[in-house]
Amino acid sequence: MVKLSTIVVFCLTFFVSIYQNYISFFMPSNCRFYPTCSTYMILSLRKFGVIKGIILTILRLFKCHPLHQGGEDLVPLKIKDKSEY
């Protein structure tokens, strides 16, 4: 049986892929990060699941402003637990 979280990850990844292939094609490329935010979302969803993937993506989007220099911002290898702070 397929888990609900797997289905949600698939659906979100599908919609982001539609955005990447059909909608962003008509918009000028101005992403200041590598990988792009849409690719970052797909990677974080696949690696950490729905909740943590969305949180990581939102935190990434908060960095997207003119005062941030951008550059390489990869999905973390692991997320720190509260006990590691």
From Swiss-Prot:
GO terms for cellular component: plasma membrane. It is a peripheral membrane protein. Its main location: membrane. It comes from the Bacteria. It holds the Pfam family YidD. Keywords: Cell membrane, Membrane. The keyword Cell membrane applies. InterPro entries: Membr_insert_effic_factor_YidD (IPR002696). Belongs to the UPF0161 family. This is Putative membrane protein insertion efficiency factor. It comes from Buchnera aphidicola subsp. Schizaphis graminum (strain Sg). The lineage of its organism: Bacteria, Pseudomonadati, Pseudomonadota, Gammaproteobacteria, Enterobacterales.
